[in-house]
Amino acid sequence: MVPGQAQPQSPEMLLLPLLLPVLGAGSLNKDPSYSLQVQRQVPVPEGLCVIVSCNLSYPRDGWDESTAAYGYWFKGRTSPKTGAPVATNNQSREVEMSTRDRFQLTGDPGKGSCSLVIRDAQREDEAWYFFRVERGSRVRHSFLSNAFFLKVTALTKKPDVYIPETLEPGQPVTVICVFNWAFKKCPAPSFSWTGAALSPRRTRPSTSHFSVLSFTPSPQDHDTDLTCHVDFSRKGVSAQRTVRLRVAYAPKDLIISISHDNTSALELQGNVIYLEVQKGQFLRLLCAADSQPPATLSWVLQDRVLSSSHPWGPRTLGLELRGVRAGDSGRYTCRAENRLGSQQQALDLSVQYPPENLRVMVSQANRTVLENLGNGTSLPVLEGQSLRLVCVTHSSPPARLSWTRWGQTVGPSQPSDPGVLELPPIQMEHEGEFTCHAQHPLGSQHVSLSLSVHYPPQLLGPSCSWEAEGLHCSCSSQASPAPSLRWWLGEELLEGNSSQGSFEVTPSSAGPWANSSLSLHGGLSSGLRLRCKAWNVHGAQSGSVFQLLPGKLEHGGGLGLGAALGAGVAALLAFCSCLVVFRVKICRKEARKRAAAEQDVPSTLGPISQGHQHECSAGSSQDHPPPGAATYTPGKGEEQELHYASLSFQGLRLWEPADQEAPSTTEYSEIKIHTGQPLRGPGFGLQLEREMSGMVPK
């Protein structure tokens, strides 16, 4: 028994109250000579056919082989004597009107068969049924205890349709519909087909246990329905099965969608899609296409396949970029391909990020190698050289580059490339801090470098004068880097203080200036050559003081000339004095005009780096000494007396590399002797020589 389901009552309980008065008690006795085998419960779907197999045996009593045997199937509560059977082989007996032509006794009771065929089962047919056999005069028996129950169920079974999974457009196809409920002697159902892919003549019904349909699909038939109908009864009981046609076609309707940081996907439209993302973001690219059979999907960056799918896999292919990098920029193409064709869609991905690795590339004259400089770098450049600064950074979109110097914007050398700054031959005014700015919507950076201008020594001096202790000389030089100064007396290097107290050297320095004063005590020998030399890595200069005529230098109150010179020398000096007075007056007028412009270049003898020098330098602004330099200041009423005023430049050259040895050049400049404390001695004179080596500014 099935729990919770109502079970049919036993035939004895149903038939006994009705049949007992009719049949008498004897007919209900269970005689072992009578037996019947039948299925206790027979299910049948409504409208279908079922065969109830049945076998019986009865005693050979009152009949022989020629005696006809009659069998009757009665519905429960029907009197065998007065009621109509639902099926019988007795032609003289009327059957129940509702079961006529549907219930048929197909078995031969004379041969021990009582099988029953039930066609087009109806809901009202559900009941108990028992069999009665009659043969001869004595066999009259109803098998009440061997009845069966006919269970009529709802029709849930559907036909099976056999069709290829994918139909080729333009190619004939055969479809079969089968309903697996066929019994021998049961009538065949009626089959029919409906669908958009079929012409009306294809929908005519046919009667069989299966149906075969042939047609030629077209691409338009894809995703349409095809239905097989199976009809079983005159009351319209039927079953049907619908299949969806899958006609092959090339990929179409390719769609790309994206999602940022695990957000919902956003579908993108356009022939070529442009997408901007920021560096470091999470990005998921999705690609889907409609095709039959399913297409193989792939993501391609440039010509490199990043991922692909199988036709039997998911219909959507995803590509995840975790922490997008700058190198992920490029054209991503989704391709969908099957045996009938292909389709693709492109996406241009631009990864945006602020300036990175900002640096300055430096190109200097006579150098083929570029230097990469970072922030805070000090850049030494030789005066007169050309300089090219290129600001370089990585960003997307490109950052806006600009140059400033001490906070003031510097115009680019090439407007089309604002990151390039070209400086003309470097001068002192170019010294300072240069800053490249890289401005970007996502952030900005800057890099600064300090430009220092280097140049070789510019010698000022030596200049000498008599003082109470002896001869006092001073020498100064300006250079970058700061120069070194040394004194030579003849071939002897003078450093510090002499142990005998014959000389004393006092050095000093301030910024680019180097100063040195020399005090000589005692008598000086004839053929005196006193030399001051300044040098740094870029070159050297030197100046010398000579004693022109032999004799002994003495400190006195005037300039005495030896009797050996005679009256001719006196006349010559008188002539020179007149000439000098005239020159000094002219030079003083010129000096006043140049004083304001040349105050920042102190020099007693005039800087060599000017490229030329006026013959008249006395009283000019360059007579101002450098910081810390020892000078002689004329007293009130004293006049400077010019004894020698000759200046020559020989073989001046442009800057040359420091490792190339340059020839020395001798120059002559003015010697000033103050009349208050003159140098005197028999036949004495002073001459200044400058030796320049290394490189000379243009």
Curated annotation (Swiss-Prot):
BP GO annotations: cell adhesion
Pfam families associated with the record: I-set, Ig_3, V-set
Alphabetically ordered keywords of this record: Cell adhesion, Disulfide bond, Glycoprotein, Immunoglobulin domain, Lectin, Membrane, Phosphoprotein, Repeat, Signal, Transmembrane, Transmembrane helix
Ig-like V-type domain span: 31-134
Subcellular location: Membrane
Post-translational modification: Phosphorylated on tyrosine residues.
Binding sites annotated in the UniProt record for N-acetylneuraminate: R132
Gene3D superfamilies, per database record: Immunoglobulins (2.60.40.10)
Modified residues (Phosphotyrosine): Y668
Coiled coil: none
Annotated PROSITE patterns: IG_LIKE, IG_MHC
Spans traversing the lipid bilayer: 562-584
Domain (Ig-like C2-type): residue spans on this chain: 159-244, 251-350, 355-452
First and last residue of the signal peptide: 1-27
Membrane topology: Single-pass type I membrane protein
Recorded GO CC terms: plasma membrane
S-S pairs: C49-C186, C54-C114, C177-C228, C287-C334, C391-C436
Tissue: Expressed by macrophages in various tissues including Kupffer cells. Also found in brain microglia.
Short sequence motif ITIM motif: positions: 642-647
Keyword Transmembrane helix: yes
UniProt-annotated glycosylation sites, renumbered to this chain: N55, N90, N262, N366, N375, N497, N515
Subunit note: Interacts with PTPN6/SHP-1 and PTPN11/SHP-2 upon phosphorylation.
Family classification: Belongs to the immunoglobulin superfamily. SIGLEC (sialic acid binding Ig-like lectin) family.
Purpose: Putative adhesion molecule that mediates sialic-acid dependent binding to cells. Preferentially binds to alpha-2,8-linked sialic acid. The sialic acid recognition site may be masked by cis interactions with sialic acids on the same cell surface. In the immune response, may act as an inhibitory receptor upon ligand induced tyrosine phosphorylation by recruiting cytoplasmic phosphatase(s) via their SH2 domain(s) that block signal transduction through dephosphorylation of signaling molecules.
This protein's domain notes: Contains 1 copy of a cytoplasmic motif that is referred to as the immunoreceptor tyrosine-based inhibitor motif (ITIM). This motif is involved in modulation of cellular responses. The phosphorylated ITIM motif can bind the SH2 domain of several SH2-containing phosphatases.
Protein's UniProt name: Sialic acid-binding Ig-like lectin 11
Species of provenance: Homo sapiens (Human)
